[in-house]
Swiss-Prot record:
Family: Belongs to the DTD family.
Subcellular location per the Swiss-Prot or TrEMBL entry: Cytoplasm
Keyword entries, A-Z: Cytoplasm, Hydrolase, RNA-binding, tRNA-binding
Enzyme Commission no: 3.1.1.96
Record keyword Transferase present: no
GO molecular function: D-tyrosyl-tRNA(Tyr) deacylase activity; Gly-tRNA(Ala) deacylase activity; Ser(Gly)-tRNA(Ala) hydrolase activity; tRNA binding
Stated role: An aminoacyl-tRNA editing enzyme that deacylates mischarged D-aminoacyl-tRNAs. Also deacylates mischarged glycyl-tRNA(Ala), protecting cells against glycine mischarging by AlaRS. Acts via tRNA-based rather than protein-based catalysis; rejects L-amino acids rather than detecting D-amino acids in the active site. By recycling D-aminoacyl-tRNA to D-amino acids and free tRNA molecules, this enzyme counteracts the toxicity associated with the formation of D-aminoacyl-tRNA entities in vivo and helps enforce protein L-homochirality.
Record's protein name: D-aminoacyl-tRNA deacylase
Coarse class of the protein's main subcellular location: cytoplasm
Record HAMAP family: Deacylase_Dtd (MF_00518)
Record-linked InterPro entries: Daa-tRNA_deacyls_DTD, DTD-like_sf
Length: 153
């Protein structure tokens, strides 16, 4: 499971001209599910997203997490995080999980984040979405669960 995590001042997701999610300060998470990802990858990602200390404390140090700040997040499904463009000119997506199973793990991730008391907005799985954001920092991190879909070596 892969995620691009961006600290934002605000973010929104629009589908077919309708705004489906918006947040103030928090995180925008682009989440990709890879072949072989399991509930263990979901649990790892949820723990990391909830407790990652990337918000500033009173001293200006990145020392606070989503859970500690009560900030919001939007989680957007993004199979293209498994695009491989090393050969040719068109990316291959063969490492992305097939849509039915990927949707289940994506939804489970959002559900477990909510169970931790976090305010979670979402996009619409497999929809053509317009994602708008104002980066804060900018702070952008790449996360990858240690499961079988992670690169070897």
């Amino acid at each position: 499971m892969r995620a691009v995590v961006q600290r934002v001042l605000e973010a929104s997701v629009t589908v077919e001209g309708q705004r489906v999610s918006d947040i103030g300060p928090g995180l925008l998470v682009l989440l990709g599910v890879g072949k072989g990802d399991t509930e263990a990858d979901v649990a790892w990602m949820v723990e990391k997203l909830a407790t990652l200390r990337i918000f500033e404390d009173a001293a200006g140090k990145m020392n606070l997490s989503l859970e500690e700040t009560s900030r919001q997040l939007i989680v957007v499904s993004q199979f293209t995080l498994y695009g491989d463009a090393r050969k040719g000119r068109r990316p291959s997506f063969i490492d992305a999980m097939e849509p039915v199973s990927a949707k289940a793990l994506y939804e489970r991730t959002c559900e477990l984040l909510r169970q931790r008391g976090l305010s979670v907005g979402t996009g619409i799985f497999a929809a053509d979405m317009k994602v708008a954001l104002v980066n804060d920092g900018p702070v952008t991190l790449l996360l990858e669960s240690p499961g079988p879909a992670a690169p070897k070596g």
